Every structure is written in structure tokens, then in C-alpha cells.
């Protein structure tokens, strides 16, 4: 019995130390596990935030793509609608509203329709001139050249038809020359070129002419000059008549009697402005007749060269306008 107690005591102390060691190790393990869990939790939160941000960015990207596709579709529909309106304008001589429920030929719409038509006409003319130039360079026969020359004259007839329709809706747009380049506007006369100046250009480019051709061209130039002078005088008279009409009566008074007089003056002035369309039409007829007379007086090959000379002169005016607009400004 005496030997039993000490052994029991030693065993208890050993167990206690062992338990304490296990407790310490367990405590340390729990602490390390908590720290690892917190670190892992922080990483999980960052990952979740990053995933959420990626999802939001993807959602916004899809929305932007959807909006872009919708914008493209809207632009396509508007372009189709505009093409349909212009087609109706060509057929009817008016510009149709996008709603389609009523026709109108307001000044702004008429001018826009004409500008589109004129650009298309110019593109077609450029193609004709390239074809004509190529035919001349390749020494095409007179019969082949005649077909192209007649096509160019017919194309000018189409231009004056387009201008006639435009004059009905906005004659001032044609008179102002805003559909031309700045340099071209410097030489503008009643919505176009002067026939007499055109003939001077042609005569200088086609020398030598026969004696009879020179005489005929000179006579045509003189008759064109006389017609231009008559139209210019008519425009001067119209401007003076408009000024007299608008300045007649008492200015600045607002009595009922003067209001009636004012409305009467406006009605008279509107009637006189209506004659502007006639001036444009006569000037364009003169221009067309000049082309037609020119090709009758010249040989087929001379006519082809004359049409090219006029076209190249116009191209140089446009090039001059581009250089002028692009010049350095101090």
C-alpha cells in the first residue's frame, strides 16, 4: 500500500502536463483556424464583389449593345423613309411629310428635296463626262459620240425640269444659289450660268472654227446677250415695283384702316413675287436652247469637246471653292 501512492501521484502529474499541452495545442489550433477563416472570409467577400462588378459590367455592356443595335435600326428606318419620301417628291413635285397623312411643299422641304435631286444629277453627269472623255481619247466614231452627246443634252433637260419643280416650292433657294459652291455663286445669274459667257468659253476652247461656225456662234452669243439683258431689265423692274408697293401708304401706323391697306399691299407684293418663277423658267429655257443650238452648229466631235470644256470649267470652280474654304485664317 505504501508504494502505491507515489506512483499514482506521478501518473496524475504526467496526465495533467499532457492535458495542458493538448489544451495549449488545441487552443493554438483554434486561433489559427479562426484567423484562416477570417482571411478566407475576406477573400470570399472580395471575390463576391468582383463577381458582382463583372455581372454589372456585363449587364451594362448588353444594354449598350442593345441600344446601339436599336439606333442602327432606327437609322435604317429613317433612311428608308427618306428615300420613299424623295421618290414621291420626284413623282409629284412636292415633298411628303413623314407621317404620310398630308402633302406639303414648304420652302425648307422643297429646297432639301431639290438639293438631293441636284446631287444625284451631278453624280450622273460626272459619269457621263467620264464616258465622253474616254470615247474621245479612244477615237470613237461620230455615231458613238453622238449617242453620248445627245444623252448629255437630255440630262440637262432633266436638270431644268427638276429646277422648274423646285421653283414652285422655293424660288428664292434657286435664286440664292445656296445649292452651288461659293465660287460658282459669284457667276450666278437667275439661278444658273449666263449663256453668252458659256459661248465665249466654248469659242475659245474650240479654235480654229470655220468661218461660218465663227459667224453662227457670234450671232448666237449676241442673241443670248440680248435675251439676258431683257430678263435682267425685267428683274430690275420687278424689284423697283416691289419697293414701290411696300413703301406706299403710311408706315408704322396700326389703325384698322391702315391694317387693311397693309394687307392689300402684301397681297399685291405676293402677286408680283409670283412672277419670279417665270424669270427662272425663261432663264433656264435660254440655257437649254443655247446647248441645243450649240450642238447643231458644231460637228459631233466639236460638240463633245465643248461639253467637256464646260464640265471641266465647272470642276475648276468647285475646286477653287474647296481651296478657298480650306485656306488658313489668321
UniProtKB/Swiss-Prot annotation:
Residues 46-66 are annotated as: Basic motif. GO terms for cellular component: nucleus. Predominantly expressed in roots. Signal peptide: none annotated. Residues 45-98, 211-244 form a coiled coil. Belongs to the bZIP family. Binds DNA as a dimer. Interaction with the Dof domain protein OBP1 enhances the binding to the ocs element. Interacts with NPR1, NPR3 and NPR4. This is Transcription factor TGA5.
